[in-house]
Every structure is written in C-alpha cells, then in structure tokens.
UniProtKB/Swiss-Prot annotation:
PROSITE patterns (UniProt xref): ATPASE_GAMMA
Family assignment from sequence similarity: Belongs to the ATPase gamma chain family.
UniProt entry tagged with the keyword Cell membrane: yes
Binding partners and assembly: F-type ATPases have 2 components, CF(1) - the catalytic core - and CF(0) - the membrane proton channel. CF(1) has five subunits: alpha(3), beta(3), gamma(1), delta(1), epsilon(1). CF(0) has three main subunits: a, b and c.
Molecular function, one GO term: proton-transporting ATP synthase activity, rotational mechanism
Protein's cellular compartments: Cell inner membrane
Biological source species: Thiobacillus denitrificans (strain ATCC 25259 / T1)
Protein name listed in UniProt: ATP synthase gamma chain
The keyword Membrane is annotated on this UniProt entry: yes
Primary role: Produces ATP from ADP in the presence of a proton gradient across the membrane. The gamma chain is believed to be important in regulating ATPase activity and the flow of protons through the CF(0) complex.
Lineage: superkingdom: Bacteria
Amino acid sequence: MAAGKEIRTKIKSVENTRKITKAMEMVAASKMRKAQDRMKAARPYAEKIARVATHLAYAHPEYKHPFVIARDDVKRVGLIIVTSDKGLCGGLNTNAFRVVVNQMKQWEAAGVGIDVTAIGNKGLGFMQRLGANVVSQLTGVGDTPHMDKLIGPVKIMLDAYLEGRIDALYLVYNRFINTMKQEPTLTQLLPLAKMESTEEASLKTHWDYIYEPDAKPVVDAMLMRYIESLVYQGVAENIASEQSARMVAMKAASDNAKNVIGELKLVYNKTRQAAITKELSEIVAGAAAV
C-alpha cells in the first residue's frame, strides 16, 4: 500500500492548499467591498473637480495654462503605470503590461523617449526588467490609497511637463467594470483634452467665478489638484480591480483543488480496491493449493 500512502499524502497537501486559497478568497471579498465603496465615494469628487477645472482652464482665453497647451513636436512622454504590490490576482497586471508594451513600441517606433513613474511593486519590477527609464516610484500603497503618498511621484512628472522635459503625460491602470471584469486603460492626462466647440461657446456666454486676487493662482492650483485627483481615482480603481481579480482567482483555485481532491480520492479507492482484490486472490489461491 505504498502507492496508497503516497496518494493520501497528496490529498492532505491539496486539502491544506485549499484551506489557504479559501481563506484568501474570503479576505479578498471583504477587501473588495471596502475598495469598491472607497472608489465609488471618490467618483463624485473627481467628477465635480473635473467640471470646475475644465471651466477654469478655458474660461480665460487671455491666460493659457501650460497644461492645456498641446505641443506640436512630442519628443518625450511621461507614463504613470499603476499596478498591484502583490500577485495572485489572475491576469490583472499582465493585461496592463500588454497595453503598456504595445504603446511603448509605438512611441519608440516614432522616436519618442519615455520616462516612467511606477506605482505598485509589480509594475516597478516589470519596468526595470524591461529596461525602462524609471524616474520615480511608489510601492506599499496598501489597500487604502492616500493622496499625501501619491503627490511625490506625481509631482515629479508634473514638474517635468512644466519644465518641458516631457511633452505629454499618460496614465495606465485597471478600470473597475464589475467583480468579474476589469479593463486595462490608457488615458492621457496632459495636455488636457481640448473642449468641444459647443462647450467652448457656452463658456463665453455662461457665468464665471469671482477670483481674488486674480485668476492665475486659482487656475494653477486647481489644475494641479485635478491631475492629482485623476491619479488617485486610477489607483482607487486599480485596488478595487485587484481585490476583485484576487477573489475570483482564489475561488477558481479552491474549486480546482476540490476537483483534484475528488480525483485523487477516486484513484486512492481504486488502488485500495485493487490491493484488497489481490490479497483475496492470493488467499483463495493458497486455500485451493492446500
């Protein structure tokens, strides 16, 4: 019964693995709900600041903030990539990496240089292996993103844009669709998207804010805060996506472990049955010989 003992050991090992994946699934489910609530709570602020920032940026044609001026000759771009710090979340990070690699190939083919800010340990490791020029990084964001942690790496990119070291800024993250679906998303942060002609016309005839002492410092501060809020929202969406993907991955692992245990038990029972049958046959044969 050496084979039977081996199979029992395998069954015990898979059962222990299943306990771990089941526990991780439950933890991820709890974190997912909190991350979704946090992400949804941040959306109204992001939408409101987007409206205010857009209004401020285009309401004063006499002052054009650098964030709204598109540059004709794009020689270098900045890329902020948001990923998870930990693995075991299915193909979440791999899907984001695929989008990044495809876009980087297009930029490189056009002779455009790339500076990278990596938020998340997985993205940092990937970009370093890729040989990318990582100018800033942030790891250990945790389950609750804090703006004071994000400001440092993001400001490095914003300063690079203001100083002309990069001509455009992009953000890559996993957008949360639902528990079963997360979509890798590449969005342009800078320069800000040009307004539609209808929106532009409405600004000229619509109300405006009263600025004290003047509009410039208000516009400068608001647009900076707007870009920071976009990055924060991207990180919040990515965390919700990560926990959802991890819960689904751990559930699949638990289900697979259950199937493997069933198959191993079947093999064990067949092996045991064959051993018993063999012993009985030997006993009968011995009795017949006597």
